[in-house]
Amino acid sequence: MAEKNAKASIRAKALELGFDAVGFAPTAGSGSAQAGNELRQFLEQGCHGDMAWLGRRIDQRAAPTALWPAARSAIVLGSNYGPGDDPLAILAQPGRAAVSVYAHGRDYHDVVKKRLKSLGRWLASDFDCQLKVFVDTAPLMEKPLAQSAALGWQGKHTNLVSRRLGSWLFLGVVLTTLELEPDQQESDRCGSCRRCLDICPTGAFIAPYRLDARRCISYLTIEHQGHIPAELRPGMGNRVFGCDDCLAVCPWNKFAQASREAAYSARPEITDLSLTELAALDDDAFRTRFRQSPLKRTGRDRLVRNALIGLGNAGDASAMPLIESLLDEPSPVVRAMAVWAARQLLDGAAFASLGENRSAGESDPAVRAEWGWEPDSNVPSPESGEG
């Protein structure tokens, strides 16, 4: 009875602090081995791309007790960031910069971590326990834990799906020395549905529940540091930071609710951003504009790279003066995508004229390949692992 009362008190406190979902999971077993094996397979197939850090401390990722042997229970918290409107509508406006819903407001790490620390202080005071808090910053696999804690299940798109809140949940975890009875694990409710798989514009899903990050727009626009493979650029459309397609089409979103968290509210300087405005940012303007935003993690050069791909896909030749000004950028990834965007917007003769007198001054193989001065093999494919 005391344990049940403890769980009820913890749940009530977490909701009071602003969390939208609370569950309790064991720290050993309950899918840990399976999650670890799936991660190893993902890594062995090279599907992680540039994310070499995923291969470090795999045993700790797979089992919370390997990360912290004293842990007896995991309290898994969900923070709803559901959008108030259709996140896919912006894709029909090719001149605008499409940013993933999770980055429309303040950086969620700051919001969730502050609440986790508040919950942790209360737990330590009221229950005399030890604990550690995590929000996407340690080798801990939050989604399998969230499924074990009955917050939802990992859908065919590999993200968590909640019966009550759909696909829009940020996750945080408290590992504690408290012995708390686990909640009953949520079962998979995807059935025969494959909407998330079929909508992917770059074919990133190898199979249901299996993602090749090297083809995923979220990975390419946020994590990938090099040149984006040419065959994947058209599918990016105007997406410059992340992609919500597979999340947004999930039928379980009919139960989703718009977030009540003010910090996640859409900021006009992010949601009303044009591709030309984004591509024109210098480093100082980038840092000022995105100071408290997740967009800051890409750095200015990669975000401009993404915007140039969007401009090439948009087909609006009025962007050419801006694109031409970026042909002499210090960053090779910016120069290369400026060349690619120009090729999309100009006829052959105009493109050739633009490249006159530039060959001698360009040494980067990938940029030269975009001009057509080097073999196309210099532009990496998603399977090559280069770039």
Language-model regions, residue ranges each:
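Amphipathic alpha-helical scaffolding segments comprising HEAT/armadillo-like alpha-solenoid repeats
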Residues: 285-289, 316-328, 346-359
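Auxiliary alpha/beta "docking" domains used to position bulky ligands
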Residues: 1-189, 237, 353, 359-365
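C-terminal amphipathic alpha-helical segment
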Residues: 232-264, 277, 281, 285-309
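Short, charged low-complexity linear segments at domain edges
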Residues: 161-185, 213-232, 282-287
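Glycine-biased, low-complexity coil/linker segments
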Residues: 385-386
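Short inter-helical turns and helix N-cap capping residues of alpha-solenoid HEAT/ARM repeat scaffolds
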Residues: 300, 330-332, 360-366
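Structural detector for internal amphipathic alpha-helices that build alpha-solenoid repeat scaffolds
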Residues: 304-314, 335-347, 368-376
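Iron-sulfur cluster-binding cysteine motifs and their immediate structural context
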Residues: 19, 195-219, 239-263, 322
